[in-house]
Swiss-Prot record:
Pfam family, one: Pox_ser-thr_kin
UniProt keyword 4Fe-4S, yes or no: no
Post-translational modification as stated in the protein's UniProt record: Phosphorylated in vivo. Autophosphorylated in vitro.
EC number: 2.7.11.1
Cellular component annotations (GO), alphabetically ordered: host cell endoplasmic reticulum; host cell endoplasmic reticulum-Golgi intermediate compartment
Recorded superkingdom: Viruses
Organism (species): Vaccinia virus (strain Copenhagen)
Subcellular location: Host endoplasmic reticulum; Host endoplasmic reticulum-Golgi intermediate compartment
Catalytic activity: L-seryl-[protein] + ATP = O-phospho-L-seryl-[protein] + ADP + H(+); L-threonyl-[protein] + ATP = O-phospho-L-threonyl-[protein] + ADP + H(+)
Keyword terms, alphabetized: ATP-binding, Host endoplasmic reticulum, Kinase, Late protein, Nucleotide-binding, Phosphoprotein, Serine/threonine-protein kinase, Transferase
EC class of the enzyme, as a word: transferase
Protein name as annotated: Serine/threonine-protein kinase 2
Active site as annotated: D307
Function: Essential serine-protein kinase involved in the early stage of virion morphogenesis.
């Protein structure tokens, strides 16, 4: 195993490693602390033995378990008010197209399966190197609007995650079949299973059964019951039919309060905003200022995030005002939260070229590509924006597109507006609450 602590983009040109080599970028103490709590080599008995185990149960024996007082509240879904993390476990909080994310204590741990046949381990470090590079080079408070990983482990064997998923899936299948008095089988229909699981997951009786069987059958400190349907969609998607869940990266992040898309009117007001639309203006303005300051840096006018959307913006506590200077103006944020850009997996900047997007983009793009996509996703996430005529009309300037040049909100053609377009946009009265401190 190698260790590299330099946060400069030179990571991109480190010598290639053997297939079995692992490397740690960033803080080794954070990383090793997390790894010490994971069993990457846990194995389970063959599934046929699990099937035979469940033959010892029927509806009557399950009913007796349901009548017990014991319940592990960590097996409720996290959005359920009854959920409580009673153990120091890894709790599944999200699975997207490219990563499986867990929470433990005040950390977020992201596992990313990488296509090792397409990229060397050092070609998959953008999620660590790009934000670290930007943070080290930005000079003002704008650097506070970036989420930097504390550590990243490259080229780790991650087969245990897929094995764990299959074990939990088989347990749920057999448990549901036993509850319904059906013949036990490990064959399943995706549609039928998801319907049965979603119907039961919020039931206190079902959670009591999970409280009994998860420790007995799974015996792991990784709890994947929360949002299990997302993990199901990830592993069962047809595009991953022949996927090798072999190696990938492990990334350690600070724990955020929320992702930006989780804020509704009630929460926006609780956070101190006058309305949901004012909150949306807040995150838009902070992201715009971040991009403008990045584009001021030497050789950074090629910066692309490539996935700028509300769920890739995280909210953190802000204990002091954030002040960002631009020309003769200063933008003052006295809110008790700040927004910060996250998930740089497909990003590029300066000389850090990301092969994951280089091969996908057929034409040249700049900041406008990101904000075109950002505005589309904002309008989709928050239809309330339309109630503010001035703001919604202004945002439409970013999405003057047609089906021929825009596909699923992403530009297919090269539109290279200068960054001055964005600078002028944020000087409007729309953002007067923050310009010069609202004076």
């Amino acid at each position: 195993m190698g260790v590299a602590n330099d946060s400069s983009p030179e990571y991109q040109w480190m010598s290639p490693h053997r297939l079995s080599d692992t490397v740690i970028l960033g803080d080794c103490l954070y990383f090793n602390n997390i790894m010490s709590q994971l069993d990457l080599h846990q194995n389970w008995a063959p599934s046929v033995r699990l099937l035979n185990y469940f033959k010892n149960f029927n509806r009557e024996t399950l009913l007796k378990i349901e009548e017990n007082d014991y319940i592990n509240s960590s097996f409720f879904q996290q959005k359920d008010k009854r959920f409580y993390p009673i153990n120091d476990d890894f709790y599944h909080i999200s699975t997207g197209g490219y990563g499986i994310v867990f929470k433990i204590d005040n950390y977020v741990v992201k596992f990313v399966f990488e296509a090792t046949k397409l990229y060397s381990p050092m070609e998959t470090t953008a999620e660590f190197t790009v934000p670290k590079f930007l943070y080290n080079n930005l000079k003002g408070d704008e650097k506070k609007l970036i989420v930097c990983a504390w550590a990243m482990g490259l080229n780790y064997k991650l087969t245990f995650l897929h094995t764990l998923y299959k074990r939990v899936l088989h347990m749920l299948l057999l448990l549901i079949q036993t509850m319904d008095g059906q013949e036990l089988s490990l064959r399943y229909s995706s549609k039928v299973f998801l319907k049965a699981f979603n119907e039961r997951k919020d039931s206190i009786k079902f959670v009591k059964l999970l409280s009994h069987f998860y420790p007995a059958v799974i015996n792991s400190n990784i709890n994947v019951i929360n949002y299990f349907n997302r993990m199901f969609h990830f592993f069962e998607h047809e595009k991953r039919t022949n996927y090798e869940y072999e190696r990938g990266n492990i990334i350690i992040f600070p724990l955020a309060l929320y992702s930006a898309d989780k804020v509704d009117t009630e929460l926006a007001i609780k956070l101190g905003f006058k309305s949901l639309v004012q909150y949306i203006k807040f995150i838009f303005l902070q992201m715009a200022l971040l991009y403008i300051k990045i584009y001021e840096l030497p050789c950074c006018d090629n910066f692309l995030h490539a996935d700028l959307k509300p769920d890739n913006i995280l909210l953190f506590d802000s204990n002091e005002p954030i002040i960002i200077h631009l020309k003769d103006k200063k933008f003052v944020f006295n809110e008790r939260i700040k927004s910060a850009l996250n998930d740089f997996d497909f990003s590029q900047v300066a000389g850090i070229i990301n092969k994951k997007i280089k091969n996908n983009f057929k034409v040249k793009h700049n900041w406008y590509y990101d904000f075109h996509f950002f505005v589309h996703t904002l309008l989709k996430t928050y239809p309330e924006i339309e109630k503010d005529i001035e703001f919604s009309t202004a945002l439409e300037e970013f999405i003057m597109c047609t089906k021929t040049d825009c596909d699923k909100y992403r530009l297919k053609v090269s539109i290279l507006h200068p960054i001055s377009f964005l600078e002028k946009f944020i000087m409007r009265d729309i953002f007067s609450d923050w310009i010069n401190g609202g004076n």
